C-alpha cells in the first residue's frame, strides 16, 4: 500500500476527475463484454469492454472475477500491443491493482512490470506515457516492500525525464525520493530532494511548492511539532474541482493477533475470502472529514471501527469555496488480506503472514476510464505522427 503522499503525487499527475462522480455498481459492463465477445468484436473494443467489466467486478468485490476477466483479455490481445500499446498496458496496470488487493504479490509485481515493458517497447523509454507508468511501477515497489529498488528507479526516471523534456515527471520522481528519505529520518537529504523537485517543476508550480511545504511539515512533526499540520492547513487552499490533497492520515489500527510464544499461529483470517469495506465521507471546506460511514462491508466487521477512525482523522487541504458549500464526497475501498505464498513443506499457495490494509479510491473509477480513453487517444496521436 502506498504512503498517502506517494499516492497523492501519483494522482496529481493525472487530469482532475469530474466533480460529483458517484459509483453505482451493476452488471452493465459485463453484459456489454459478453455481447462484444459474441460478435467477435475488434481487439480495441474487446480490450475496452474488458477493462470496463473488470472495474465493475472489482467495485462489486468480485476480485477473482476481475482478475480472470483481465487475464483472459491479456491472453487474447497481447499480440496487438504494437497497434494498441496504451490499452494493452492498461490491462496489465489494472491487473496489478486487482492482484494487490487479492494478495498475490507475484502477480502484482509481474503485471506492474509488464505494463511498463509494453510502453517501453512500443512507445520508447522517454515517451511521457511510459515515464508515467515507470513512476507507477516504482510506487508499486514501495508497496511491495522494496524501497531501495524504488529509490533507484526514481533516480533513473528523474534523470531520463529531465533529459527528455518532461520536467513534471522529473519533479515527481525527485519528490518521491524526498519522501523515501523522510521515512528513513534523513531530513537533510529529504529537503534537498524536495528542493530539486521544486526546481525541476518551476517555481510557479504551486502543487510542487505545496508538497515541499507538506514534507517540511512532516519533518517538523517527526521532530515533535504537533501543531505543524494546523499551521500548514491555515496557509493552503485548493479548488473543489480538483483532486483533494491529503495533508495527514494515520495508519489503520492493526488488529493482527499477537504472535504465540511457542508454535505456529494460524490466523483464522487467512483463507480464500476477500474482505473489504467501502467507506463514504465528505471533505468539508475546512479540510476535515465528516459524515464518515461504512457503506458496505464484506467480512471486515472487526476492522470497521479502525477504518472509520482513520478516515475521520484525515486532514486535507482546505477548499476554496463559497460559504455553505457541502464539500467533496468520496468513497474509499479498504481491503484487508494476507499475502499469498507457499509455506515450507507444502505445495499449495495460501495466505500467510500479517494482514495488511490496501486502499483505492472508488470515486476515481469513472475518471480512470476517461483518463484511459485520453491515454489511448494520445498514444494514437504519437504513433500517427
Language-model-derived ranges and their functions:
Residues 14-139, 143-385:
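Charge-biased low-complexity segments
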Amino acid at each position: 500500500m502506498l504512503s498517502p503522499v506517494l499516492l497523492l503525487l501519483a494522482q496529481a499527475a493525472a487530469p482532475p476527475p469530474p466533480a460529483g462522480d458517484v459509483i453505482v455498481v451493476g452488471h452493465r459492463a459485463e453484459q456489454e463484454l459478453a455481447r462484444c465477445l459474441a460478435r467477435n468484436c475488434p481487439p480495441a473494443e474487446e480490450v475496452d469492454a474488458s477493462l470496463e467489466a473488470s472495474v465493475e467486478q472489482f467495485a462489486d468485490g468480485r476480485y477473482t472475477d476481475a482478475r480472470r476477466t483481465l487475464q483472459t483479455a491479456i491472453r487474447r490481445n497481447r499480440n496487438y500491443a504494437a497497434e494498441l500499446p496504451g490499452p494493452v498496458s492498461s490491462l496489465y496496470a489494472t491487473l496489478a491493482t486487482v492482484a494487490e488487493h487479492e494478495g498475490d504479490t507475484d502477480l502484482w509485481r509481474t503485471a506492474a512490470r509488464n505494463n511498463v515493458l509494453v510502453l517501453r517497447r512500443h512507445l520508447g523509454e522517454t515517451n511521457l506515457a511510459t515515464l508515467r507508468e515507470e513512476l507507477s511501477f516504482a510506487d508499486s515497489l514501495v508497496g511491495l516492500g522494496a524501497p531501495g529498488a524504488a529509490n533507484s528507479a526514481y533516480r533513473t526516471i528523474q534523470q531520463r525525464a529531465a533529459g527528455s523534456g518532461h520536467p513534471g515527471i522529473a519533479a515527481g520522481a525527485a519528490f518521491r525520493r524526498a519522501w523515501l528519505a523522510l521515512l528513513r529520518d534523513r531530513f537533510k537529504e529529504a529537503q534537498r530532494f524536495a528542493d530539486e523537485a521544486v526546481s525541476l517543476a518551476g517555481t510557479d508550480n504551486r502543487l510542487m511548492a505545496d508538497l515541499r511545504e507538506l514534507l517540511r511539515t512532516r519533518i517538523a512533526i517527526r521532530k515533535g511539532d504537533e501543531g505543524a499540520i494546523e499551521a500548514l492547513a491555515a496557509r493552503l487552499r485548493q479548488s473543489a474541482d480538483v483532486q483533494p490533497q491529503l495533508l495527514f492520515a494515520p495508519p489503520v489500527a492493526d488488529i493482527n493477533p499477537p504472535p504465540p510464544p511457542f508454535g505456529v499461529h494460524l490466523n483464522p483470517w487467512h483463507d480464500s475470502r476477500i474482505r473489504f469495506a467501502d467507506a463514504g465521507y465528505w471533505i468539508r471546506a475546512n479540510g476535515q472529514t465528516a459524515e464518515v460511514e461504512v457503506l458496505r462491508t464484506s467480512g471486515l466487521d472487526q476492522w470497521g471501527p479502525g477504518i472509520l477512525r482513520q478516515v475521520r482523522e484525515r486532514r486535507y487541504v482546505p477548499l476554496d469555496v463559497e460559504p455553505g458549500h457541502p464539500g467533496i464526497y468520496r468513497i474509499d475501498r479498504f481491503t484487508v488480506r494476507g499475502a499469498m505464498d507457499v509455506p515450507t513443506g507444502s505445495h499449495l499457495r495460501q495466505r500467510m503472514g500479517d494482514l495488511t490494509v490496501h486502499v483505492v479510491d472508488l470515486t476515481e473509477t469513472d475518471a480512470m476510464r476517461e483518463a484511459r480513453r485520453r491515454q489511448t487517444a494520445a498514444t494514437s496521436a504519437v504513433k500517427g505522427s
